[in-house]
Amino acid sequence: MRSWNGNPGGDSLSTKHITEKTGVNINIVTPTGDVSEELNLMMISGTLPDLISLGSWETCYNTLYEQGYTYALNELADQYDPYFWKVVDGSVVAWHTKSDGNLYCVPNDAYGAEQMAETGMTAAVQTFLVRKDLYEDMGSPDMSTPEGFLNTLRTLKNEYATYKGVDITPFYAQGGSGYGLTSYLQNFLAVPYEEDGKIYDRISNPDYIEWLKTFRQAYQEGLIGIDYLVDSDDQVTEKSNNGAYFCMLREWSGMQEANAILASSENPDSYYIAIDGPANSNGDAPLIFPGSLDGWMSTFISKDCKDPARAIAFLTYMLSEEGQKDIFLGIEGETYEVVDGKPQLTDEMIELMNSDPNTFATQYGL
């Protein structure tokens, strides 16, 4: 069971391949209502799924291990599959080990400092995006300074309020003022978290205050509205898919579907590209959030699982390099190939991923 993403997975090429290799049939169940309510009912009735992937923000997250509904993974690994310790990052394990000394779950999308240093890989997805054709028609202006940002929005208001038949919404900030205009913007301005070994007050940073004044001025001049504060997720999706936003402080991972739709539309250059966004007065490169030890979704093995030995072995496989290749790349020679010693999706798969992400996900499971 997982609390997010309803793709059942079992009929895709990737999941069939994994079943053939491991003997494990994958049946993904996603809650139809409140995840904590459904899991609480399962706890009471003794019908918890074998594996549970859950966000740490869910109210039942702590209940699962504090009230004994899930196994300690360290104990299962020591008893049945010591190779588990070879495929998990030590710093991630230490971060998620509870006060009783047990590890009850492993997160995805978690990045330890050692891993980032060794591989150069991070989870950075924060971008400043503009609609490509509109931005280029405006002369690709510099928007990294308060003056440049305001002048660009003035040009937009005066000359491009409607563009190629679309009413343009000037600006969107992901998460509104609680994320897009706080930590997200501060990261673009390279505002530090600490200075001389002490916690730094990012809110009072002069460059950050200057940019907040810039957004206030933009609102006062009618250059931006309050759409980014009040639009629902469905409204944001609709506007994105229609190329209705001009610029956005938005995580790139949320734009893949929209860009695929726009690239195949009657205006194929209406997709979004990343450019240099708001910067501090020194013009420093942004300090984009690279990922954390927390990760995102964490996976537990429930005590209703009838074969915990196979469950920990399957979890170990999924965390291993072999499992990660099977999950993200599929089958060598069919969906990916090795070029210069590095695996990469075939050109056909890349084209499908960009043009039809739904088919890419449901048919191939990648």
Tell where the protein language model's regions lie, with residue ranges:
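Extracytoplasmic/secretory soluble proteins
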Residues: 1-366
